[in-house]
Amino acid sequence: MRILITNDDGINAPGLMVLHEIATRLAGQDGEVWTVAPAFEQSGVGHCISYTRPMMVAQMGPRRFAAEGSPADCVLAGLHDVMKDSPPDLVLSGVNRGNNSAENTLYSGTIGGAMEAALQGLPAIALSQYYGPRNNAIENPFEASAQHGVDVVQRILAHTPQETGGYRLFYNVNFPPVPGDEVLGIRLATQGFREGLGFSTEPHNAPSGRRFLWIKGGDQHRPTAPGSDAQLNLEGYISVTPMRADLTAHDMMAPLAGINT
């Protein structure tokens, strides 16, 4: 198996090293793992693509490239340049430093990389490691993803139907904020929503007198609906959410039919 990996935390992020190990084990002795990851931090860029400027790509080592762009840019560079003569069988994005469950999904560059791969017609999985008191205190906060990542990806690939239909399918995997041995299992999950304040701004004044704002995130440990991603993560489960690049509110099509003329 040939696997392309990317992330949004950057080429030197520890989560990318975890993902490389996961991908290496998945690819097997006869497989290949290729890395095309952002040269700089790209967290929160979503599905951004840099079509208004050129993108510099530098080779950092064997099958290892850094691109001055977003995770989606990196996937495009991997598919249409770096690996153009022999495309990958699978694209993995992550392992993100922090969860991409609930509304975080909508901002995530990690998700953006997987979504772009799906739009390009490839199997794609985003992987993220929830942070919390129970895994922040251990030597490797990525322990849960490192220990269970191979099994989760193998299960997803084994159970994905040959024909997925409609808009391209991809997966969002979030590992719980617990040590690896305390993971309770794997659960299919819906995308949750954390009620209350999400992102906001915090004003500051520079010594020069100029005013600026920091973007602040909300409480990541607020519960979400039963059976949804963040709730299951906080209970100790790995969540697997199948997703599509389709933002249509299908449940509103019939109630809004009166709009038609």
Swiss-Prot record:
A divalent metal cation binds at residues 8-9, 43, 96. One of its GO terms (molecular function) is metal ion binding. It comes from the Bacteria. InterPro entries: SurE (IPR030048), SurE-like_Pase/nucleotidase (IPR002828), SurE-like_sf (IPR036523). GO terms for cellular component: cytoplasm. SUPFAM superfamilies: SurE-like. It is found in: Cytoplasm. Its EC number is 3.1.3.5. Pfam families: SurE (PF01975). Nucleotidase that shows phosphatase activity on nucleoside 5'-monophosphates. Belongs to the SurE nucleotidase family. This is 5'-nucleotidase SurE. It comes from Roseobacter denitrificans (strain ATCC 33942 / OCh 114). The gene is surE.
